[in-house]
């Protein structure tokens, strides 16, 4: 669901509204399984925001190739193949996966978002505090955003 939003809707919104600084975008982690948590952990180790957004795009674009595997180690290796192109070598990837503070931060963000914003499905998008859950399309979001510009 998040990958679908990111690839089919967000990329167009990025070109139309983010790249020319008309709107601000914030990605918040909401992992639903261990594979997603580990992807968020290595994403959290990318310090450059532009690189982080590019890596997020790459992870979503290739989600079908890494999100499933025979065990979590094989999934992690698939994630590493993607993140290696973004300045994270295997040692840094492993440090990120073992970073308990980072894991706590991601999981606490998920728990707090669930409570504060009553998030029940992903993706959940907020535009000026108005919540959008479920299926939407590019035109719906663009129209909702343009109301505030």
Tell me the role of every PLM-derived stretch.
Residues 7-10, 81-149:
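C-terminal cap of thioredoxin/glutaredoxin-like
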Residues 1, 66-67, 96-99:
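Short, contiguous strand/loop micro-motifs
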Residues 3-84:
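Structural alpha/beta surface segment adjacent to cysteine/selenocysteine redox centers
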């Amino acid at each position: 669901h998040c990958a679908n939003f990111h690839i089919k809707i967000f990329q167009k919104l990025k070109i139309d509204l983010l790249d020319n600084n008309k709107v601000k975008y914030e990605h918040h982690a909401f992992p639903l399984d261990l594979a997603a948590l580990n992807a968020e952990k290595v994403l959290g180790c990318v310090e450059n925001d532009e690189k982080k957004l590019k890596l997020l795009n790459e992870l979503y674009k290739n989600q079908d190739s890494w999100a499933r595997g025979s065990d979590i180690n094989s999934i992690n290796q698939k994630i590493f193949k993607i993140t290696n192109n973004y300045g994270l070598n295997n040692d840094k990837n492993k440090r990120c996966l073992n970073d308990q503070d980072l894991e706590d931060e991601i999981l606490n963000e998920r728990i707090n978002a669930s409570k504060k914003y009553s998030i029940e499905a992903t993706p959940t998008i907020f535009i000026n505090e108005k919540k959008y859950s479920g299926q939407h399309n590019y035109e719906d979001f663009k129209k909702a955003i343009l109301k505030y510009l």
